[in-house]
Amino acid sequence: MRNNAITRFFSEYSALGHVLEGRDLLALARATVLQSPAILRTRKLTSIDASMSRNMNVRFGKARMAMPLADIDRILAARNDNPTFGNVREMYARNCYLEHLRLQTPLDAVLDLGANRGMFSLLALLALGAKTVVGVEPVEIYGPVFRLLLEANGCEVSRAPRYTKFISCPSVERQNPDQTVSIETIMREQGIDRFSLVKMDIEGHEQAVFSEPAWLAHVDNLTMELHPEFVDDLHPISKALEQYGFKWMSFDQAGHQVNIQSAMFLYASRTSSLVA
């Protein structure tokens, strides 16, 4: 297990070398030395993430994004949230949402379901050139964090509308319109006919969203984190994707292609954008 922790760290360390600037790589090296006992003891990188709570710039492809991590973590301190550098590792260094998609950019409209701090929304705006990114995130405290990210990167708020609701299907939305919103309503209210990309990380709510899958007819590409701990049977997701003409692949946390019920990430496309 100790060897697994070491292997995982050095794999992520290598990936971080492609996104961090020199001074932040040096800070990472220092944090590695200081936190190595905690890493080996816990087999987690949380201590590194906490040590790297500093304002920095991150590269993703040709894009350079301002990441005020220290400011974000101060906002989220009352919620006892995970240090935001962990999101940098997973989303930008590991490229967990786009690793198996080769998208033709710039994109038009992007839908970020489970938008959290808004770091994928920012990536879509700056690195993928999205015209509009609609976010859905029910936790209110992430709203100020996202506005901070937009301001730090000179992005207009009008390009990134956000719903502070749970995403669900139309039938659930009709029963509880104050707390839930459907993709169909988002498209109608935002005047969007089609999404170039949908990113989804909604902690088990995918079961309801895919129970009424007509929205897939208006989507080109999909990337999602799966939650088998919350959803007993994920196969309706793959069936719905195939019904609407998508090719898809699913992978475990280590990056091995596996069946959907054992997977953590799923990538789907009907624009021939999938890569193994």
Residue ranges of model-derived segments:
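Phosphate/nucleotide-binding beta-alpha loop and adjacent structural elements of enzyme active sites
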Residues: M1-A276
